[in-house]
Amino acid sequence: MIKNYIKTAWRNLVINKVTSLISVAGLAVGIGCFILLATYLLNELRYDRFHVNANRIMRVAYNYKSSDDAEAKSVAVTPTAPVPVFKQQLQEIEDGVRISWYNNPVQYQDKLFNEKRFFLADEPFFRIFSFKFLRGNAATALKDPSALVITASTAKKYFGTEDAIGKVLKVNNKLNMMVTGVVEDVPEYSQIKFDIIGSSAGSEHAKTRKWDSANDYSYLLLRPGVNINSVEQKMNNYVAEMFKDDFRQGHKMWFKLEPLTDVHLKSQATYPLTPSGNIRYIYVLGAVAIILLLLACVNFLNLVTAKAIERGHEIGVRKVMGAARSQLFTQFIIESAMITLVSLLAGLFLADVSFKWFSDFSGQQLGFQTWNTSWLIMAMVALFVTVTFLAGTYPSLYLSAFNPIVTLKGKLTNTSGGRALRKSLVIFQFVVSVFFMICTVIAGSQLRYIQHLNIGINRSQVMVIDVGGKSLKDIKSFNNEVTQLPGVLYATASYDSPVDVHGGYSINHADGKNSDYNLSVTALPVEKNFLNTLGLKLVQGINFTDADEKHSTDADENKRYYGFIINEKAAKALGWTAEEAIGKHIGLNGRTGEVRGVVQNFNFASLHQEITPIVMFTEDYFGKVLIKTSGNNIAKTISAVKEKWSAFNPATPFEYHFLDQEFDDMYKAEQRTGSILTAFTLVTIFISCLGLFGLAVFSTRQRVKEVGVRKVLGASVFSIVKLVSGDFLKLVIISVIIASPIAWYAMHRWLLDFAYKISIQIWVFIAAGAVAILIAFITVSVQSLKAALTNPVKSLRSGD
């Protein structure tokens, strides 16, 4: 019996080629897109879950607020004290580890690389995190102060096929460190991404227990069954008691325990170890995946029910011949299952050939290998059953319920209920399409606005070179030579790249303020040409001078006196105008000096946040050189700078990037989501138009005789096209009216995440509506024009 059902179903699919092809095409595209998005979402959601103790590992976020801060700050970095202190104080904590950046040039024989993913970590690192060892012992790998653990790719880079264990690498041209372990390359879905982990046992920094100067990434391993909130409360009670005098004065700090598996998508802390995702974008893309699948199913459902009238005679004959409703239901479900199976296979093929494109698009390495094989099989079976049920159940019930007498008499017509359902489904499809069109345009406009917004910094054509930590004397020597090169306008230096500037500084003394005054600020040690190089505009006062550099680098720390340049936001937070700020004395984390100048507000950080108070001062130690180029013959300029660098510091590889790239990287999550949304907006339009075209085919077939009569009576081609297309265009207009307020609300909420944002313009809704109507008109007109141009005699004959 089943074999007969399958043969009959296949014959019907072949006979009804148009319906079958449109159904398969729509379902295949919908399923393929669903698989692509599901794979992307799986990759995002599995971050850090490969660790054996993932559910017990907590990242410590550091929160602080002074009495004069408008709001609290939350950062992913902590001082050195929390991990060793809380391990000792709280029995609920089984272990803990601190990680700190240690980017330095590393050399083995004639191989020299500037390692960007080099960290120092406490000994328990590999006991807490489950990175798989290929060589060495995880329990003791970081016990020795000079120990290094490297990834398999790093081992191959330095040693080829030789055994890496016991090999000695020279770090920063002075420190010998021995390889004690080799681990598998870190998975892409790990927020701790490293190439080299060194022992921090020999670091003076790691031996300290400071509660200020946050630079470490801290993780705690809780004992099984421990309540996270209880541990967090005990930690914060301890801190409140230790610093009760500071708390009375309004300066507070507290810690938040963030489950490791939540860090990538849910953490709000700034300065993460690696760029974070956003759980809201996961929800959005998850909804897009489901909606695309629903659109494809709706398409199929619409086409089958519309086609039902043409199958009425077949159903009537089979019922008269004794076919039960259950048998007809089974027949139609098998037809749906066959279309779903073909569509699923086609969708898998489309997904497979699209993975490379989608990987480039999304910035992740995606493919069927992302899935566990058994998971993939179960997912595809579930998808097959779900789509068959969604797309096949109603049409099967609908078709098998036809009255055989009515169908055999040829009196089966479109019922009002059937028409209403099909209209509702068309409206649903175009509501989705118009909604995505509006959202895509607004999101794109916001991202373009951010990219071109004047943030007070001239970031264009600024090279950033990682110098690995150099004195002011060395920096000035190099910069003096570089500025003589054609194509170089200015050169300066800073402790960090402007984009990586951390908070954690406080102005704890200022003229005219109480002794307990404390204002949290962002601070940046810079070389005196920093303002000129980045085009920062002085609104009051003077730039740094040679005297400032001399005073701030005095060998006797007690004699150091700093010149400070602050931004307008800092002056306002201090209660001063720009004019009043000049000459005022302030204290910054133990540094004392006076305000030399006030610059126009500028933004180093993401435009999700407001501009913060910023303080700049000269110092004697720098990690980055910034070179402003003219932009003319940039390749030649880079080559010349590289030549100077090689002569100046042959022990450190020349590596550079451009500052505007760093700024763009801050919005990768938004750009990625926007790009994905744009691509799948086009897919929703395609699926909607595919369904609309199929319905137009059936609609014109039902109105063949009417069209013929109208032509005989003198109707023009335009009037017939208008007649056939009009009903569909009304549905699209209704869709625009429904989608517009929903899209406005969604994008209004999204824009609230940005401190600097566009206003939503009415033209976006008008343009999206016009595009949707135009696309629908073109889609339907292809078929209605064909009907209008058909010989009326032929139309009247076919209508008999």
Residue ranges and their predicted role:
Residues 32, 36, 256, 337-404, ...:
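Small-residue-rich transmembrane alpha-helices
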Residues 122-135, 148-277, 477-669:
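Mid-to-C-terminal secondary-structure elements
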